A protein has these predicted regions:
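Sec-dependent N-terminal signal peptides
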Residues: 4-14
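Sec/Tat signal peptide C-region and signal peptidase I cleavage site
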Residues: 16-20
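N-terminal "mature-domain start" segment
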Residues: 21-51
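Surface-exposed amphipathic alpha-helical segments
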Residues: 38, 151-179
Length: 179
């Protein structure tokens, strides 16, 4: 039985199993992919954004570390694609350090897992206060983000914290249909 089919069957069982399966995939692959970054706050699509995902949980539960480079250009994109794993660790340690300095409450966890059509969406919460984000637009996190797993590729959606979950899902559904 194909490996991908087995993974999808596991994801269908429960939210907890879904979270665990996605986490295991991230942990094993370390770097899944570099995907496009959609900024939904101004309803525009920005191509060339980078999304890299890797683990950072001390308790080995469903906690992940997420880095989104504020610098979007082809040179850095190519650099990250070819960067050795050890240097990539250092890159994101430094990058995420900026967020830790801004907020001691820094944490990202899987909040929910939803099935929209054939694709899976992970809704995650970032605890960085919105007032800090408003002061410095270069900070990598807003208060509510979502990931979609599409053909083994991770997409990050940055959303306004004042939007409702229903609005988020509507936005995601629209984008998913365009993939």
């Amino acid at each position: 039985m194909p490996k991908m089919f087995l993974v999808l069957m596991i994801l269908l069982l429960t939210n907890n199993i879904c979270n665990a399966a996605i986490y295991k995939n991230i942990e094993n692959d370390f770097l899944i992919d570099i995907g496009d970054n959609w900024n939904l706050s101004d309803k525009s699509t920005q191509e060339g954004g980078m999304v890299l995902i890797f683990t950072a949980s001390d308790d080995k539960k469903s906690t992940v570390r997420v880095g989104v480079s504020p610098v979007i250009d082809e040179k850095e994109n190519a650099t990250l694609r070819n960067m050795p794993k050890e240097l990539l660790n250092e890159y994101f340690d430094a990058f995420i350090g900026m967020t830790k300095q801004a907020s001691s409450k820094y944490n990202i966890t899987f909040a929910d897992c939803k099935n929209i059509g054939p694709h899976y969406v992970l809704l995650v919460n970032a605890s960085l206060p919105m007032e800090i984000y408003k002061k410095d637009k270069q900070l990598p996190f807003v208060k509510s983000n979502a990931f979609i797993v599409f053909k083994k590729k991770i997409y990050l959606f940055m959303m306004d914290s004042w939007d409702t979950e229903e609005t988020h899902l509507q936005q995601l559904t629209t984008i998913i249909k365009s993939l």
